[in-house]
Structure formats: structure tokens, C-alpha cells
Regions:
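Extended, small-residue-rich solenoid/repeat segments and analogous flexible loops
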Residues: 1-29, 93
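Conserved small/polar residues in nucleotide/adenosyl-binding loops
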Residues: 139-141
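Generic detector of short, locally flexible boundary/turn motifs and exposed helical patches
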Residues: 1-4, 34, 88-89
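A composition-driven signal for long, intrinsically disordered, charge-rich low-complexity tracts
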Residues: 18-20, 33-38
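Flexible, glycine/small-residue-enriched loop-and-beta-strand segment within the central core
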Residues: 30, 37-134
């Protein structure tokens, strides 16, 4: 078969702004298929900086299929960004400590949208914002 190896970091020789994402992520809760790439002229290997509020205790996953094209400055907002809105306040008192720890909601009381899943062959354009729990299926033409 022709084409670059899916295990290559930078599939275009001399053009480091494009990288195959699966070869640069270290978070086990980010799963990326072969040939999906991220294009960023500043630091293409630091894809994980675009996955926001992805706390281990939330146990949510970002799953990206094969052959996806992800442009510069795309952000994935994960479930850790959600605030409890069913009580008196949505303010996260507990994260500031100093006696406010008792206001910590149970994990099950926080809004949870599930894993964020991007199917195969999906293009995500420049500066897009993908919210928690979004499921985007394969690209259709």
C-alpha cells in the first residue's frame, strides 16, 4: 500500500506543522485512529493543549476516528467544564477550599454528557469549538 506510515509523527517531510495525532498524545482517555492529523504551524505535537477540562476523575474519553482533518485552534471542551446547575448556585465553591470544601457536589450530581466521539473522515475547521458529549459521525458528501 502507498502512503505514509500511520506511525509517523510528521507525514510531510520538512513540514512539521502537520502531525498524525495518535503519535503525539499521551493521555489514555484520548483515542485517535490512524492517519488523523492536526495542522498547527506553532506546535502541532501539542494537540492535548486543545482538550480542555479533561480531568481524570471524570473518566470521559475523546475518541477521534481514522482519516480526520483537524485544523489549527480547534478546542474540545470535556465534561469537567460542566457546572451543577440544579442547586442554589452554579458557582464551584469547593474548588477554592478554605472551608468551602463541604460544598463539593457528588460526581453523579454533575452534568455528564458522555464521551466526545468524532467518527472517521471528519473535517473540523479552524477555531471550531466541540462541546462535551458531541457525537459526530462519518463525513457524508
Amino acid at each position: 500500500m502507498y502512503g505514509p506510515s500511520p506511525d509517523t509523527r510528521h507525514p510531510m517531510e520538512g513540514f512539521d506543522q502537520v502531525c498524525f495525532i495518535k503519535n503525539v498524545v499521551h493521555n489514555p482517555n484520548i483515542v485517535v485512529g490512524d492517519y488523523s492529523y492536526y495542522d498547527d504551524p506553532v506546535d502541532s505535537e501539542n494537540f492535548e493543549r486543545n482538550v480542555l477540562y479533561h480531568y481524570p476523575f471524570m473518566n470521559d474519553k475523546l475518541i477521534i476516528g481514522k482519516f480526520c482533518a483537524i485544523a489549527r485552534d480547534v478546542k474540545f471542551v470535556m465534561n469537567g467544564a460542566n457546572h451543577k446547575i440544579s442547586g442554589i448556585t452554579a458557582y464551584p465553591f469547593s474548588i477554592f477550599g478554605n472551608g468551602w470544601e463541604g460544598a463539593t457536589p457528588e460526581l453523579g450530581d454533575l452534568p455528564y454528557k458522555g464521551d466526545t466521539v468524532i467518527g472517521n473522515d471528519v473535517w473540523i475547521g479552524y477555531d471550531s469549538l466541540i462541546m462535551p458529549g458531541v457525537k459526530r459521525s462519518e463525513e457524508r458528501r
